[in-house]
C-alpha cells in the first residue's frame, strides 16, 4: 500500500472519530426557528427605536416652534405696549401744549 493512502486512511478514521455526529433534524429546525425569531425580533426593536427617535425629534421641533410662537407673541405684546405708551405720551404732550396755548390766550 502506498504511503499516502495509509496516511489518508488514518486521517479519515481519526477525523470521523473526533467529529460529533450532526444534530438531529428537530434540533436543527428548532435552532433555525430561533434564529428567524431572533432576527425578526431585532428588526422590530430597531423599528421601534427608530420610531421613538423620530417622535422625540418631532416633539422637540414642535416644542421649539411653540417656544418661537410664544416669544413672537410676547414680543408683539411688548411692541403693542410700547406703541400705546408712546401714543399716550404724544397725546399728553399735545394736551399740555393746547392747555398752555389756551391759558396764554385767556390771559392775553
Swiss-Prot record:
Use of this protein: Can be used for targeted secretion inhibition. A construct with this protein's ligand domain inserted between the C.botulinum neurotoxin type D (BoNT/D, botD) light chain and translocation domains, when injected into rats, leads to decreased growth hormone production. The GHRH ligand domain binds to the GHRH receptor on somatotrophs where it is taken up into endosomes. There the translocation domain inserts into the membrane, releasing the light chain which cleaves synaptobrevin and inhibits growth hormone exocytosis.
Question: What UniProt keywords are attached to this protein's entry?
Answer: Amidation, Cleavage on pair of basic residues, Pharmaceutical, Secreted, Signal
Its BP terms in the Gene Ontology are: adenohypophysis development; adenylate cyclase-activating G protein-coupled receptor signaling pathway; cell-cell signaling; growth hormone secretion; multicellular organism growth; positive regulation of cell population proliferation; positive regulation of circadian sleep/wake cycle, REM sleep; positive regulation of growth hormone secretion
A GO molecular-function annotation:
peptide hormone receptor binding
Question: Which positions make up the signal peptide?
Answer: 1-20
List every position bearing Leucine amide: 75
Spell out the SMART domains in the cross-references. Answer: GLUCA (SM00070)
Its GO CC terms are: extracellular region; extracellular space; perikaryon; terminal bouton
Q: What are the residue ranges of the propeptide? A: 21-31, 78-108
InterPro entries per record: Glucagon_GIP_secretin_VIP (IPR000532), VIP/GHRH-like (IPR046963)
Instruction: Give the matching PROSITE patterns.
Output: GLUCAGON
The protein's job, in short, is: GRF is released by the hypothalamus and acts on the adenohypophyse to stimulate the secretion of growth hormone.
Q: Per the similarity annotation, which family is this?
A: Belongs to the glucagon family.
**Under what name is this protein listed?**
Somatoliberin
Amino acid at each position: 500500500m502506498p504511503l499516502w493512502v495509509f496516511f489518508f486512511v488514518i486521517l479519515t478514521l481519526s477525523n470521523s472519530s473526533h467529529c460529533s455526529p450532526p444534530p438531529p433534524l428537530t434540533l436543527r429546525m428548532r435552532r433555525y426557528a430561533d434564529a428567524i425569531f431572533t432576527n425578526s425580533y431585532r428588526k422590530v426593536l430597531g423599528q421601534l427605536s427608530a420610531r421613538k427617535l423620530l417622535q422625540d425629534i418631532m416633539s422637540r421641533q414642535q416644542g421649539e416652534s411653540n417656544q418661537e410662537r410664544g416669544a413672537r407673541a410676547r414680543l408683539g405684546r411688548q411692541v403693542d405696549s410700547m406703541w400705546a405708551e408712546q401714543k399716550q405720551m404724544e397725546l399728553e404732550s399735545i394736551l399740555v401744549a393746547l392747555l398752555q396755548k389756551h391759558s396764554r390766550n385767556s390771559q392775553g
